[in-house]
Amino acid sequence: MTTNQTDIQNPAAVDLDKVQPKPGLGSNFETAAYPALLFSTKSRVWSDKTPEAIEPTDPAYEGDGLRQKTQVKDGHRCMFCGFYSQQNQVHNLTDNHRDIRPENLRTADPLCHGWQHLGELSEGNAVIAYLPGLSGQDANHLQRTIMIALQSDDVNVREDAKKMLNWMASHRDYTKDAWGTYYPAIFSTALVRLEDREARQVVFEDLAVVFNPGSFAKYASAWARESYRTLPVNKWSQVHHDVMNAPA
């Protein structure tokens, strides 16, 4: 595309009262970049031989290469938060793992996917914490970063990561005070009765899943190689300093 020099104006000479925005400008902000990250659980299907599975186990799923096709279609990015990883999983939009139609399959990173499988999170693997002001996506991005830091060779980095994770997990006490429990599997029983997804967003507002990092050690190693390679842990302190001391 060429630019006509006569179309270029001096910004100082523009009459702001006569400026007309282009039609459709800003319309992209009317739609959220990612869907809301809500609690859900796997649909209970009679004769399901793998009730704890978090991905489809139908032979046709692997036989037809649906897992790989779904990942490629989504560019290996999570539908909920946009995180890129070759280690991402496949989520069934209807929560029914027998439904393996291509349009029902989307890519989800292991943390966001965990939100969709509260009933499959056993005691000790995760808790439900009250974290007001922190979106589910941000809570997962923070936990992912913590999990990578926990594998650092720097003992100070590991200690800081533990403190941050413990702070997040400690907010499970607020959940227990309000709900009587902080176990994901118990919350999943309430989800079965609450089919309205929009209602879930209101009822469970400000609640987040805080995961046990031990279950994600293999993922954390891959995340460090893939998405954090250009920003290794040993540079985080400098980045924090630069951001906090950036000129106004």
Describe these PLM feature segments.
Residues 58-110, 116-130:
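Histidine-centered nuclease catalytic patch
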